[in-house]
A protein has these predicted regions:
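Acidic/polar N-terminal loop/beta-strand segments that form early-domain functional surfaces
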Residues: 12-14, 42-44, 80-81
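Glycine-rich, proline-tolerant flexible connector loops at the mouths of alpha/beta enzymes
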Residues: 40-66, 84, 139-147
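Histidine-acidic metal/acid-base catalytic patches
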Residues: 1-38, 59-70, 121, 125, ...
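Conserved beta-strand positions in the central sheet of alpha/beta enzyme cores
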Residues: 40, 77-79, 136, 215, ...
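Short acidic, glycine/proline-enriched helix-loop-strand junctions
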Residues: 49-74, 153-161, 181
């Protein structure tokens, strides 16, 4: 409990074309006025952060820290939920998830995946430059369509899926390790990491990579019929965000 500094808010859920939700300054003032102490910044919103610049320039990151700090706030994490989703997309969901990709990469699954991997790696460097120790993201999903037991999945399909998911994420995890930042996967419906067992399977597939951790958001757990209190008992050592 000694590490708790106060409430924080994920800005992505409130972004809008209208003020104050269309600028970093406006959103910082709004959050501070409501009593928040921290903000989680979605990296796909370029008016909130220039991720390319943040990965390259310490001066830019120092200015960003100062700007947020002037409102009495801290940056808690950067988020690559949308880009992380695109690290692994089953073809059945191509059309839906294409909306998360830049226009130039739409209808280009291979290019989209390569872009997503590169972008999440940049977030690792940017996180270090911002003095952050945790990063928020989604795992993506190659197996979500198999969660229901009918039709029966062929033997070995699930194992193959987690092996491929780990193969895509391991180079990213290594970059985060080089930068001293934990990757916190939000346990969420539609992701291959959607409960405790799937988290464990991914952890095993990555050979227990030390940067594989959990973003704990219990808001989905009741609908999934998961015990959100017992989950903490089982996985507290991995909950870093």
């Amino acid at each position: 409990m000694k590490t708790i500094k106060g409430p924080a808010v994920f800005l992505a859920q409130f972004v809008d074309k209208k003020a104050p939700f269309n600028s970093l300054e406006g959103m910082c003032k709004w959050a501070a006025d409501l009593g928040y102490k921290g903000i989680q910044i979605p990296t796909w919103e370029s008016f909130l952060i220039d991720l390319d610049k943040a990965a390259e320039s310490q001066d830019y990151c120092d200015e960003l820290i100062g700007k947020v700090g002037s409102y009495g706030l801290e940056i808690t994490e950067l988020s690559t939920h949308l880009q992380g989703q695109l690290v692994a997309v089953h073809p059945a969901y191509d059309l839906m998830f294409d909306n998360f990709a830049p226009d130039k990469l739409k209808k280009n699954p291979k290019g989209r995946t390569e872009w997503a991997i590169d972008t999440v790696k940049k977030a690792a460097v940017a996180s270090r430059r911002l003095g952050l120790k945790a990063h928020a993201t989604f795992s993506g999903a190659l197996l979500w369509h198999t969660w229901h037991p009918w039709p029966q999945a062929p033997k070995g399909l699930v194992e193959m899926g987690f092996e491929e998911l780990a193969k895509r994420w391991l180079p990213i995890l290594d970059v985060f390790d080089e930068n001293g930042v934990d990757v916190c996967y939000e346990i969420h419906p539609g992701e291959d990491l959607h409960d405790g067992i799937t988290f464990e399977r991914f952890l095993k597939a990555t050979k227990n990579h030390k940067r594989v951790n959990i973003l704990y958001d219990p808001s989905h757990f009741i609908l999934q019929q998961l015990d959100y209190i017992t989950y903490i008992d089982h996985y507290h050592e991995f909950i870093k965000s």
